[in-house]
């Protein structure tokens, strides 16, 4: 077991660096019914269950940005956040609906089970989608043997 500790430590470091350096997920802008440019941004596309005490994300911030034809932020539009129906009982959005302020509507996504979920944000008859992976908390290095 002792000879595996450095290898496990190295693997943990690679995991930490890869998630810390992962870029934000950004959907390209699309035009809405009223000509607004709508985009979706996700802070973490990989989150972990029960990772408290570790430097691993347990939730993801989801941001919808809405701009007019001149690129100015659009305020006051309702944005509804949701997940595919099979995940409805296993995820949360806080809040589930928000209005744009300074051109942005934000929510915090969380889940209570592992897997891959497609999330959606709907604004002005446009739906933007993203995929978030939820994994179990990694086992501590050297644990169990």
Feature annotation, model-predicted:
Residues 1-20:
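Sec-dependent bacterial lipoprotein signal peptides
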Residues 17-19, 95, 118, 127:
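Short, intrinsically disordered, low-complexity terminal segments
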Residues 21-74, 85-91, 113, 122-145:
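Short S/T/G/P-enriched beta-strand
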Residues 50, 95-96, 107:
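Short, conserved secondary-structure segments in the cores of folded domains
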Residues 78-81:
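Hydrophobic beta-strand segments
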Residues 94-102:
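Short, acidic Ser/Thr/Gly-rich low-complexity loop/linker segments typical of extracellular
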Residues 105-113:
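Short, hydrophobic beta-strand segments
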